[in-house]
């Protein structure tokens, strides 16, 4: 009978006390079959479930990051407003959705404007009323300026639905009333020809911007100078024409305005299309529609002045 206080003999097959080593030690195989043994706690070969740790997950791909120059973009930095960087614009789906949304809004705006111009031009009582009551034009101009400044300068209303749609609708109707009032002062033939010329110019510029490799967005300084020149010329022309009408000066200003806003249309179109030095954030679809629509309407008004057939 063994002493209870003595350590258990090797013959006791207690799992906590392995048996004595065989004579000569353990043999080492030349090649370990099946690779290295599993570390304690990890699943042993042949078992379908882990012993203590979960199975390792498959590797995940990193999300696209907004890298600066020198990180995969050949050192060229694309300036994008807010938090949207080149990574987001590399996604064709995001860009195409943005472009479709912008041009859908522009199409609705142009349809409303053409309808107002048609009413003010072809319906004689309406045409006579707006020619006699110039206050309609000035009220529309005030609404146009206020809504344009809010949409262009205030990010909150521009991005918050439904305020952005409400402001854009007010802006569109104000611009339509202004354009309709101007159109009522010209012959119907001149209005139709100006519409056709504007449509041809706008479509041609859009197709050109889709195809060309010329980056108009890199010439921001040039467009600022053009805008200042057009503004100063407009002020001088208004002062001169207020005292005495000078036909050639009026035509010169109209031609300069048509050329400048055609270039502005190319610039704003490339801002919307993306993949240029400067782009518009995908959240600012209202801004894209606002700019392109304004360019098209101003091209129409300047071309209409060049036609010169007043009532």
Curated annotation (Swiss-Prot):
Segments of skewed composition (Pro residues): 53-62
Region span, Disordered: 1-37, 50-72
A Pfam match: Bax1-I
GO cellular component term, pick one: membrane
Coiled-coil zones: none
GO molecular function: calcium channel activity; death receptor binding
PANTHER family: BAX INHIBITOR-RELATED (PTHR23291), PROTEIN LIFEGUARD 3 (PTHR23291:SF35)
Role of this protein: Negatively regulates aortic matrix metalloproteinase-9 (MMP9) production and may play a protective role in vascular remodeling.
Family per record: Belongs to the BI1 family. LFG subfamily.
UniProt-recorded name of the protein: Protein lifeguard 3
Species per Swiss-Prot/TrEMBL record: Homo sapiens
Gene name as annotated: TMBIM1
């Amino acid at each position: 009978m063994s002493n209870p206080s003595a350590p258990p003999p090797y013959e006791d097959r207690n799992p906590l006390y392995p048996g004595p080593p065989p004579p000569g030690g353990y043999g080492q195989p030349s090649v370990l079959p099946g690779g290295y043994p599993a570390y304690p706690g990890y699943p042993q070969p042949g078992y379908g479930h882990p012993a203590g740790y979960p199975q390792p997950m498959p590797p995940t791909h990193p999300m696209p990051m907004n890298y600066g120059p020198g990180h995969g973009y050949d050192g060229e930095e694309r300036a994008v407003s807010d938090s949207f960087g080149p990574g987001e614009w590399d996604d064709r789906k995001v860009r195409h959705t943005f472009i479709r949304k912008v041009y859908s809004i522009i199409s609705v705006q142009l349809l409303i404007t053409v309808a107002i111009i048609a009413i003010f031009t072809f319906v004689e009582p309406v045409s006579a009323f707006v020619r006699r009551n110039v206050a309609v034009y000035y009220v529309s101009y005030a609404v146009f300026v206020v809504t344009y400044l809010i949409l262009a300068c205030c990010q909150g209303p521009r991005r918050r639905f439904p305020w952005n749609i409400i402001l854009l609708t007010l802006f569109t109707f104000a611009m339509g009333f202004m354009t309709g009032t101007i159109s009522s002062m010209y012959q119907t033939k001149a209005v139709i020809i100006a519409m056709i010329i504007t449509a041809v110019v706008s479509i041609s510029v859009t197709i050109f911007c889709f195809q060309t490799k010329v980056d108009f967005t890199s010439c921001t300084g040039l467009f600022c100078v053009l805008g200042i020149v057009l503004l100063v010329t407009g002020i001088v022309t208004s002062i001169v024409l207020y005292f005495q009408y000078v036909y050639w000066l009026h035509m010169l200003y109209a031609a300069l305005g048509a050329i400048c806003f055609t270039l502005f249309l190319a610039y704003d179109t490339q801002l919307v299309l993306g993949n240029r030095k400067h782009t518009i954030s995908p959240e600012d679809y209202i801004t894209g529609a606002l700019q392109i629509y304004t360019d098209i309407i101003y091209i129409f008004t300047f071309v209409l002045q060049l036609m010169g057939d007043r009532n």
